[in-house]
Amino acid sequence: MGKILTSEEVAQSLEGLESWAIVEGQLIKAFKFGDYLEGIAFAGRCGKIAEEMNHHPDLLIQWRKVTVSISTHSAGGLTALDFEFADKIEG
């Protein structure tokens, strides 16, 4: 479990992430794809990273779109681990 970030730390961490937002205490981004199977492949990649980090997001899989939502439940808010996960799936 990590330390909950302050609002200033959250704002600073968001600067390095394109199109991510904070919604109801979650770090969220919707990723768009050319077809459904591309989205499924992306979700699989997210799952692999989540297992490696032992930090698991919520994934909403829709036609040509996957929405990723993450926070550190054990800490009760956003931590550096959430932003590290976001950075890894962007890479």
Model-predicted segments: where are they?
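Helix N-cap motif at beta-to-alpha junctions
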Residues: 35-36, 75
